[in-house]
Amino acid sequence: QSTYSKLANFYAFNISQPGIPIIYYGEEIGLMGEGDPGNRRMMRFEINQDERNLKDTFSKLNGLRKKYVSLSLGDQTIIETKGPIFATLKSYFDEHTLLIINQSNKQITTKITLPINGELLVAVDNNHKINIIDNSVILEIEPMSHQFYYVSQ
């Protein structure tokens, strides 16, 4: 399970970076290479539940990149890189999207200070709202997971 979570976290990071995210066939299900580093195994089309979940995550992340222009075109501000937490803010005009990744096997509560003004942080997957107080929020991040939020002005 942790391997699939690591791949999902990597791809969440990947879609938040400038340029076009690249995935090779099979990466969306965690397919490993074979032989020389550039070679791939034959593609499998019957996949298990973990592989299906990873593929669904890749699809959702691609949808987020389409929906939130800041992810592809925005300026990036690295907010946090302490320990297992990585947080970055992508800003494109008035659209601000926060990505936070927990790379540990434990749930982490962390305080994030945003370099912009806003009233609410809203989770893009479930619309959970968190008040921003003095440009800061306290977030609980599940183990080996990532979360995208948008900043509501």
Short names for language-model regions:
Residues 1-18, 81-83:
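Alpha-amylase-like alpha-glycosidases and glucanotransferases acting on alpha-linked glucans and related
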Residues 11-51:
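Aromatic/acidic polysaccharide-binding cleft in carbohydrate-active enzymes
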Residues 14, 26, 61, 100-102, ...:
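Hydrophobic, well-ordered secondary-structure elements that form the walls
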Residues 44-79:
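Aromatic- and carboxylate-lined catalytic core of secreted/periplasmic carbohydrate-active enzymes
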Residues 56-67, 86, 112, 124, ...:
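Extracellular ligand-binding/catalytic regions of CAZymes and related secreted enzymes
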Residues 79-115:
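Carbohydrate-binding surface patches
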Residues 113-127:
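Solvent-exposed beta-hairpin/edge-strand motifs
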Residues 133-153:
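C-terminal beta-strand-rich structural cap/linker in extracellular carbohydrate-active enzymes
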